[in-house]
């Protein structure tokens, strides 16, 4: 046999707390909706535009070969700019360095 003991004051207090919590969450949702809907969508910035243009340039020869056409690339495609200094050449193996210095 089950027994249920309920205090009306406790139930009223719990319901009030839940209503307050619900209104707080609703206010937070409304406050966050403005800042999240104003974000740029993917592809609406300069970086995405540059990547799309580069992808178009690299996909163009593949598309032409699939279609069976041999067209020259238009002058609109440019390689990515070099950033920073060029890499230095790799060092030769240790035995080679030793002979080159004639110290061994």
UniProtKB/Swiss-Prot annotation:
Region (Disordered): 64-104
Domain PE: 1-60
SUPFAM superfamilies: PE/PPE dimer-like
Superkingdom, natural source: Bacteria
Biased composition (Basic residues): 94-104
InterPro entries xrefs: PE-PGRS_N
Pfam families for this protein: PE
Protein role: Binds fibronectin. May contribute to pathogenicity.
Record-stated family: Belongs to the mycobacterial PE family. PGRS subfamily.
UniProt name for this protein: PE-PGRS family protein PE_PGRS60
Source organism of the structure: Mycobacterium tuberculosis (strain ATCC 25618 / H37Rv)
Lineage: Bacteria, Bacillati, Actinomycetota, Actinomycetes, Mycobacteriales
Chain's gene name: PE_PGRS60
